[in-house]
């Protein structure tokens, strides 16, 4: 059985449709029967555009929910990525912003188009300098065991940038050198060989969005939609659009956009597949149990804007 339900804050002004190459092995040590993590994207702006406020609320939330790790959906450093592991942006946009002890946990990141305007290798190498930056591949996967159960969760992080034809035409650094066929083959092999109950995929580009990127993601959607459906990916998290969304088109997969870690942009509300969409600074908290995924959207003031549960 696969179903979901959702709620949102009564005073929240937003749109809502009601409906009747490397695997990292890791075991979770929590005893409450859940894995919990935060999802934030499009954040690296020296603390501006409420980035620091979002970071502070992330710290409070991570502390109260005992978060295990943070997921970044990309565009980690504006406007042109970082140049080296000694780039000042590491301090100004990351180390001096996400300062709460509760955020000194693993950060699993993917890369966005703005990251590609710098040197991706600098972000891949930062793991050598930081204990919490846990990304040294452009795309990768790991499994986590759900405490007090025999079930596992598969997390897959994609590099969606080379699948975006508009970026290739703009000649973003390194993109033309990427082998999209190899990455897609790896994705299919990883999904098809998995025995995990839950499958979560993360990438920068959304497959579905009602934000400013609407209509621009057809290349990415055509590359991954059939794969997600065939192998029953439960949820796909993206950024790129600077807002917070839950899209549920026909099919198996739920699509979330968490790209509001700093600057935000407008989002439209005219699609029947849109379960939630808001232009507000914030992030998502996800609690994953054996039979349920509970997701909460929280803004930069700590207000819960939306909740949804996927039961499996």
Predicted regions and their residues:
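Active-site flanking residues adjacent to catalytic metal/cofactor-binding acidic residues
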Residues: 41-42, 74-75, 158, 203, ...
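N-terminal export leaders
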Residues: 1-9
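Conserved acidic residues
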Residues: 68, 75, 197-199, 234
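Short acidic, glycine-rich surface-loop motifs adjacent to enzyme active sites
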Residues: 194-211
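Extended active-site neighborhood of metal-dependent phosphoesterases/phosphodiesterases
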Residues: 78-195, 214-235, 241-289
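A short C-terminal boundary segment appended to hydrolase-like catalytic domains
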Residues: 31, 274-312
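N-terminal active-site segment of His-dependent metallophosphoesterases
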Residues: 12-88, 210
